[in-house]
């Protein structure tokens, strides 16, 4: 008996008439490498949205939640007289440890997908969007708050957090809430972490780092495996404030509901000294980024002197900054800061001098003449 021929899978064949009609409908026809005139029909793929959070200023902020799907009356049972939208509770009512507040969060922010520019980027000193951090913003690029991660140069008043909420002197008894103005706190307490078999094998540190490093630079992470607790320290306090709201009532990889609080102060003197040193470094780095780069190079000794100065004269910092901003004005660049000067009115008989400041042409000429006179007098005495 002869064997049955094996079935051969072939690509669908499209005639030229069908191919032309398909192209008119917005479908791309790709020529195959076969010697025949068979063609494969393939739909056009949509352009993917960039997921680089550093390019947030080149794209519009994404609407995280459809406004029509938001229930405006989604509130906890009324136990007070005034409803606080910031804390999702009634004044004098339920605590955060009750069952209602321990449910998993309705949304989660994704910096790579959701960040973008909003109306707030045009307003200096704008605050960050609290609902964006929670993944529940319905405004998108029309929002009046920032939709991005905080950076080192984002500085706010000590009496408010990065979302514009008022802070108080003392922490709450449960170390929750907005925080305190009594000290700079960069460390978060993360509780109720589910310790699975994989976590016991040593993967819990990687899991915590992967979830919390999305909200900014992390200095260190300490995980207590036997208690299901972690302490996450960020590089800046604003990143810790953002991460606290972003990870509140979220889960890691096991579906748990996290308990995120502010960490208490470490009593170790070495840890306190390390914290103080880190805060000073952050302040110096923030000031360095706000100053002109040429000025920073001169302060750190990396720049060459643009012109020779008089012997024995050392230019102070204010004169350096004025000279650098004058150079930026001459080059057509926008100066970092406007320096206001009061110039004396020119004499009618003398031409108007374009030089300003203490060491103009006439002053330098007088100093050179005085220096030459002193040298001549010293030679005569010898």
Swiss-Prot record:
RRM domain boundaries: 186-265
Zn finger spans (C3H1-type): 124-150
GO MF terms held by the record: pre-mRNA binding; U6 snRNA binding; zinc ion binding
GO BP of this protein: mRNA cis splicing, via spliceosome; positive regulation of cell cycle; positive regulation of RNA splicing; spliceosomal snRNP assembly
Protein location: Nucleus
Organism domain of life: Eukaryota
Annotated GO CC locations: post-mRNA release spliceosomal complex; Prp19 complex; U2-type catalytic step 1 spliceosome; U2-type catalytic step 2 spliceosome
Pfam family, one: Torus
UniProtKB keywords: Cell cycle, Metal-binding, mRNA processing, mRNA splicing, Nucleus, RNA-binding, Spliceosome, Zinc, Zinc-finger
Major subcellular site: nucleus
Disordered, as annotated region: 307-358
SUPFAM superfamilies on file: CCCH zinc finger, RNA-binding domain, RBD
Family, similarity comment: Belongs to the RRM CWC2 family.
Function: Involved in the first step of pre-mRNA splicing. Required for cell growth and cell cycle control. Plays a role in the levels of the U1, U4, U5 and U6 snRNAs and the maintenance of the U4/U6 snRNA complex. May provide the link between the 'nineteen complex' NTC spliceosome protein complex and the spliceosome through the U6 snRNA. Associates predominantly with U6 snRNAs in assembled active spliceosomes. Binds directly to the internal stem-loop (ISL) domain of the U6 snRNA and to the pre-mRNA intron near the 5' splice site during the activation and catalytic phases of the spliceosome cycle.
Assembly information from the UniProt record: Associated with the spliceosome.
Domain remark in the UniProt entry: The C-terminal RRM domain and the zinc finger motif are necessary for RNA-binding.
Protein name: Pre-mRNA-splicing factor CWC2
Organism of derivation: Yarrowia lipolytica (strain CLIB 122 / E 150) (Yeast)
Lineage of the species this protein comes from: Eukaryota, Fungi, Dikarya, Ascomycota, Saccharomycotina
């Amino acid at each position: 008996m002869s064997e049955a021929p094996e079935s051969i899978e072939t690509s669908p064949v499209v005639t030229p008439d069908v191919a032309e009609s398909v192209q008119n409908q917005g479908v791309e026809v790709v020529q195959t490498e076969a010697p025949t005139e068979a063609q494969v029909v393939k739909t056009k793929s949509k352009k993917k949205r960039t997921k680089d959070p550093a390019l947030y200023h080149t794209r519009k902020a994404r609407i995280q939640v459809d406004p029509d799907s938001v229930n405006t009356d989604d509130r906890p049972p009324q136990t007070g007289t005034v409803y606080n939208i910031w804390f999702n509770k009634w004044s004098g009512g339920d605590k955060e440890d009750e069952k209602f507040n321990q449910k998993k969060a309705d949304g989660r922010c994704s910096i790579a997908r959701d960040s973008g520019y909003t109306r707030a980027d045009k307003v200096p000193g704008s605050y960050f969007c609290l609902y964006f951090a929670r993944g529940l913003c319905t405004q998108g690029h029309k929002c009046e708050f920032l939709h991005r991660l905080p950076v080192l140069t984002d500085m706010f008043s000590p009496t408010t957090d990065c979302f514009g909420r008022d802070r108080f002197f003392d922490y709450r008894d449960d170390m929750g809430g907005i925080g305190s103005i009594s000290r700079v706190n960069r460390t978060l307490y993360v509780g109720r972490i589910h310790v699975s078999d994989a976590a016991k094998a040593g993967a819990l540190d990687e899991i915590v780092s992967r979830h919390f490093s999305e909200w900014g630079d992390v200095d260190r992470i300490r995980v207590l495996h036997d208690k299901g607790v972690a302490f996450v320290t960020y590089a800046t306090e604003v990143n810790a404030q953002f991460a606290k709201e972003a990870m509140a009532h979220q889960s890691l990889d096991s579906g748990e509901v996290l308990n995120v609080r502010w960490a208490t102060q470490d009593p170790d003197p070495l840890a306190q000294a390390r914290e103080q040193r880190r805060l000073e470094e952050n302040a110096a780095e923030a000031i360095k980024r706000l100053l002109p780069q040429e000025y920073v190079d001169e302060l750190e000794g990396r720049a060459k002197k643009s012109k020779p100065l008089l012997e024995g004269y050392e230019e102070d910092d204010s004169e350096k900054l004025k000279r650098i901003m004058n150079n930026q004005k001459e080059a057509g660049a926008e100066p970092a800061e406007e320096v206001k000067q009061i110039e004396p009115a020119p004499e009618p008989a003398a031409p108007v001098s374009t030089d300003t400041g203490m060491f103009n042409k006439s002053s330098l000429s007088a100093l050179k003449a005085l220096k030459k006179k002193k040298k001549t007098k010293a030679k005569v005495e010898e």
